[in-house]
């Protein structure tokens, strides 16, 4: 395999409002390992995202599954961590909101069975506590990335 095939997808910096408004997703192939993408309203094809914000809530969905809400200046990212994300699940179990966190994760959309609404979430690859300066720098870089996408 070539290096390109083994490299990770870029983790895009985007605000929650853009991600929350995404309603289209697709798979790049029929193989179960084919990358899945969320298409944002700006037309960006996102497999992975990077966000920094305030972890405002952590909930136990089941014994093995935690849901975290990460707020940025425009909205909220939702992340779920369970048995396949043990480090992130442990982080969420021990976290004491509110606190600033950085999240790198896989972008996903899903549609509840009883709804026509398309919801978004990020499956965490990395979840880390950060300081205010890191959050502020991320907000500036996310704004610059957004301007590049719409410019």
Regions found by a protein language model. Give the residues of each.
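OB/S1-fold single-stranded nucleic-acid-binding modules
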Residues: 1-43
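Intrinsically disordered, low-complexity coil segments
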Residues: 26-34, 110-119
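Short, conserved secondary-structure segments in the cores of folded domains
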Residues: 42-45, 91
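A general secondary-structure signal for short beta-strands and their flanking turns/coil
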Residues: 46-48, 63-65, 100, 117
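OB-fold and OB-like beta-barrel modules that bind single-stranded nucleic acids
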Residues: 47-57, 96-109, 122-127
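Short, conserved beta-turn/loop elements at beta-strand boundaries and strand-helix junctions
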Residues: 58-63, 112, 132
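OB-fold (S1/OB) nucleic-acid-binding surfaces
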Residues: 60-85
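Extended, charge-rich, solvent-exposed interface segments
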Residues: 90-100, 113-151
